[in-house]
């Protein structure tokens, strides 16, 4: 199965953060490609930065200024996430049988054509909430939760799950039993570092922070 | 089980949209209360507006300027969502046994105290993505997916899930078999209305749009 996420209707002047979250969710929840429309190099750059630091999970990061054409020429199944669609649980088993899936995530008003072009208009509940959440739940259902355990290729840092505080190791120093040699941030440390699972934590890491830096940046 | 979501570190000048998404996810994914810190009346107002239009799902919408005190005086279990925490799948069964759960969602850097105060630091995968997605997945795991089927109390509008386009009915006109009398938006309509499952769709509806308006606003 190959899954691409197409974010349409992105407004560079006001959607940067939400769209970045959409892209990061695509990456972290098992999509193979992320395509942004219209193009916004800053968002793509942020995603590439995350891939460089945390490892490669996406095969392609791209953009298009012809999103309708992109959808029309997609040689696979088209899924459009919308609160007006059919319950995800009623269609996910069928969708999971497909080879190539394009998941459309709208930003501003979604033109009528997308509803028509989509093979599946899928709702994650029928209440208004967030396209970020909708994409995460859709992919989580699609992969049955297995997406959370994918291991990235390369990159510089890995997190060792811990009860309190932060354990971050450099790639290559994880050690056979899960990080002993590379662990410099002691357990229970906490600190002011980027603990929140949000896009913002990425922002502070452009200078190639090691695990030591993670708790010390302000 | 009673679940509250506490959003901490909100920056009114730049987090309004993300925090609104967090609040809407809390509402749509089964939380009973949403507490914002620090206070930002505009975000709370938006949530109240959604509750008024789409029906009541939250029992409490509140804010606090003493978040640490709020956590310290919480007489229940404290969960902190962080990419450095333990895998959600390894702790969710235990958490599900608790009576009262406070879910902390950070925005900017999360102070060390929260890691210490939390009974569970929980990671939705150990990759950076989005606090909006993290909260959605956590609540989805907590409720085993049942949260998507909760019915709100009152409100003005209900969506009837549909294959293409939009079906929206006024509350009270749903009809016994699912909306026949109230359905004015015909199937296959699509249109430029707010189809995306995002907070933005809420914005255009302040004037009390009926289903007719839903597809016509620009």
Swiss-Prot record, chains A, B:
Catalytic activity: cytidine(56) in tRNA + S-adenosyl-L-methionine = 2'-O-methylcytidine(56) in tRNA + S-adenosyl-L-homocysteine + H(+)
Domain of life, per lineage: Archaea
Coiled coil: none
EC number: 2.1.1.206
Gene3D superfamilies, per database record: 3.40.1280.10
One BP term from GO: tRNA nucleoside ribose methylation
Location(s), subcellular: Cytoplasm
Pfam families according to UniProt: Trm56
Molecular function as annotated in GO: tRNA (cytidine(56)-2'-O)-methyltransferase activity
InterPro entries for this protein: Alpha/beta_knot_MTases, tRNA_m1G_MTases_N, tRNA_mtfrase_aTrm56
Alphabetically ordered keywords of this record: Cytoplasm, Methyltransferase, S-adenosyl-L-methionine, Transferase, tRNA processing
Binding site for S-adenosyl-L-methionine: 81, 106-110, 124-131
Comp. bias intervals (Basic and acidic residues): 200-218
Family affiliation: Belongs to the aTrm56 family.
Protein name: tRNA (cytidine(56)-2'-O)-methyltransferase
């Amino acid at each position: 199965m190959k899954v691409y996420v197409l974010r349409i209707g992105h407004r560079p002047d006001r959607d940067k953060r939400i769209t970045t979250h959409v892209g990061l969710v695509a990456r972290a929840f098992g999509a193979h490609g992320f395509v942004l429309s219209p193009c916004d190099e800053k968002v793509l750059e942020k995603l590439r930065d995350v891939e460089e630091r945390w490892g490669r999970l996406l095969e392609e990061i791209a953009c298009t200024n012809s999103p309708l054409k992109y959808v029309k020429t997609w040689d696979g199944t088209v899924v459009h996430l919308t609160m007006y669609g059919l319950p995800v649980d009623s269609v996910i088993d069928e969708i999971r049988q497909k080879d190539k899936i394009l998941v459309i995530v709208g930003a501003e008003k979604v033109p009528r054509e997308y509803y028509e072009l989509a093979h599946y208009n899928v709702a994650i509940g029928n209440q208004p909430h967030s396209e970020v959440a909708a994409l995460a739940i859709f992919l989580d259902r699609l992969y049955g939760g297995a997406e959370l355990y994918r291991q990235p290729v390369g990159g510089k840092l890995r997190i060792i799950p811990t009860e309190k505080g932060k354990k971050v190791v450099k790639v290559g120093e994880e050690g056979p039993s899960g990080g002993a040699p590379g662990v410099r941030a002691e357990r229970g440390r906490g600190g002011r570092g980027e603990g929140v699972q949000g896009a913002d934590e990425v922002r502070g890491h452009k200078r190639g922070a090691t695990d030591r830096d993670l708790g010390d940046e302000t």
